[in-house]
Amino acid sequence: MRLAVNIDHIATLRNARNEGHPDPVEAALLAEKHGAAGIVCHLREDRRHIKDDDLARLREEITTKLDLEMAMTDEMQKIALSVRPDLVTLVPEKREELTTEGGFAIQKHFTRLTEFVKPLRDKEIGVSVFIEPEEEAIELAAEAGANIVEFHTGTYSLCTSDKQTAYELERIRNSARIAREMGLTVVAGHGLSVLNIAPFKELHDIEEVSIGHAIISRAVFIGLPAAIQEILDLIRR
């Protein structure tokens, strides 16, 4: 199983002082050096952490793959077509939220999604949709032209009992199998950490996990390389 590291909150820390450090690009290069298979950044409409210049520099400097999380807007599509990340992950976005709070409302926005995906795929940019692990959402993502789905694991991460945890894991497992049978690459992310990631090692239809806040917050105490290694030790098959 691969690990993609989200470096948004390196930028959050930098922006607290509006100075140049810590540099998210430097963090991305360090993450790659220590085992990250990809770098994730979310260019929000309000630019609350990652800035346009960060994205441009990431595209120039990283050597694994660049996953640009973004809202489904004309502005973001234009940026993606210009910067040419390896893939984009389409996420719901609300200005008042602290972090992405759930999966993309794919049923509601299906027609627009289909139109939005095509120019990106025509430029050989992979398209992932951040969805709940549900069969209908998977089918619609594939029908819209996405080649990747990322399952929102926030519900799983908030489970407070063994029964709840087992139910959510089985829901994710079954959804991953369905997605793989449709030819989609399957990623999982949101709320994953050293406290709850271990069972994902056995979910063989999930190829990659995307983790940001848990790694960056842990890195404050033990350093970024060690924080990444903790996760890798738990997910390597």
Curated annotation (Swiss-Prot):
Keywords: Cytoplasm, Pyridoxine biosynthesis, Transferase. Its main location: cytoplasm. The record marks E150 as: Transition state stabilizer. Its EC number is 2.6.99.2. 3-amino-2-oxopropyl phosphate binds at N6, R17, G191, G212, H213. It comes from the Bacteria. One of its GO terms (molecular function) is pyridoxine 5'-phosphate synthase activity. Catalyzes the complicated ring closure reaction between the two acyclic compounds 1-deoxy-D-xylulose-5-phosphate (DXP) and 3-amino-2-oxopropyl phosphate (1-amino-acetone-3-phosphate or AAP) to form pyridoxine 5'-phosphate (PNP) and inorganic phosphate. This is Pyridoxine 5'-phosphate synthase. It comes from Chlorobaculum tepidum (strain ATCC 49652 / DSM 12025 / NBRC 103806 / TLS) (Chlorobium tepidum).
